[in-house]
Amino acid sequence: MNDILNKEPMEEDYGIEKSLRPQFFNQYIGQDKVKEQLEIFIKAAKMREEVLDHVLLFGPPGLGKTTMAFVIANELGVNIKQTAGPAIEKPGDLVAILNELEPGDVLFIDEIHRMPMQVEEVLYSAMEDFYIDIMLGSGDGSRSVHLDLPPFTLVGATTRAGMLSNPLRARFGISSHMEYYQERDLEEIVKRTADIFEVEVIDNAAMEIALRSRGTPRIANRLLKRVRDFAQIMGDGRVDKAITDKALTILDVDAAGLDYIDQKILRTMIEIYHGGPVGIGTLAVNIAEDRETVEDMYEPYLIQKGFLMRTKQGRKVTQRAYEHLGYVYNEEE
């Protein structure tokens, strides 16, 4: 995939995303349904002087799950401790993290689906009853230690909700699905980022970036950064529609946010398989990508935009894809 359209965070994103991160719900653009629900739950918990129920945030990468976790902590007025599933390799690692929590704190675990099962099992009692029992030592000298924990809120984030075990999923009192962003919301995000970057962006240019951002704020901010470079070197520093079109064309991002590989998938299906159906394994071989990459990185957006559909026989290209790429659509094929 064209790196600029990769929804996973790149090294350059980390510092930038932190500086752009909204602090409270009234600064957070988009995800209105999730925000509305969480605001009610947080206000109710504060009125009862209780900790917020554990929260699961799930959805595709780049949609602001980490940002939402920090907003939750800020709205609660508590500290947040951040870690990731792959970093918690053994129960002792989890115990060390839990032991640092203060009453009411938020513990944010990103990629929670990647925690080892032995760690996950220790987490069950911590989430449900705020205690853990852990074995110390080995053999005849081993002993069980009971550790009481302060009440806390676990916020877990995952791009693979289906990989969570049922016992873990059941312990989250609140589950919030983060969805792809509407173009108008992305336009507002581009404008907000431009203000922080102190770069002038014309309205139609902001919308053009939004339209090509694959419904993802991380990509919108990354595209704005690159277009800003073109505006600085090839223009007068302002980001207008002309410089935006030129920059994104050079960067191989078309009007629908498709990159070279997206187009290659669709063209291969049209030119070789007459639009399909074709099996995902066969398609992956044809475009020289592994099956998982096609399924995880390309297919979801192509389906969401209406260019591709799944059938029992395999994947099929839609009439919209034919028209977008300039092919004549024959319904009988």
UniProtKB/Swiss-Prot annotation:
Per its UniProt record, what NCBIfam families does this chain match?
PRK00080.1 (NF000868), ruvB (TIGR00635)
Q: Where does the chain bind ATP?
A: L20, R21, G62, K65, T66, T67, E128, D129, F130, R171, Y181, R218
| Region annotation Large ATPase domain (RuvB-L): where it falls in the sequence | 1-181
Please name the GO terms of the biological process aspect recorded for this protein, alphabetically: DNA recombination; DNA repair
Gene coding for it: ruvB
InterPro entries tied to this protein: AAA+_ATPase, AAA_lid_4, DNA_helicase_Holl-junc_RuvB, P-loop_NTPase, RuvB-like_N, RuvB_C, WH-like_DNA-bd_sf, WH_DNA-bd_sf
| Keyword DNA-binding listed | yes
Protein name per Swiss-Prot or TrEMBL: Holliday junction branch migration complex subunit RuvB
Q: Specify where the region named Head domain (RuvB-H) lies, as residue ranges.
A: 255-333
Q: Which residues form a coiled coil?
A: none
Instruction: Please tell me the species this chain comes from.
Output: Lactococcus lactis subsp. cremoris (strain MG1363)
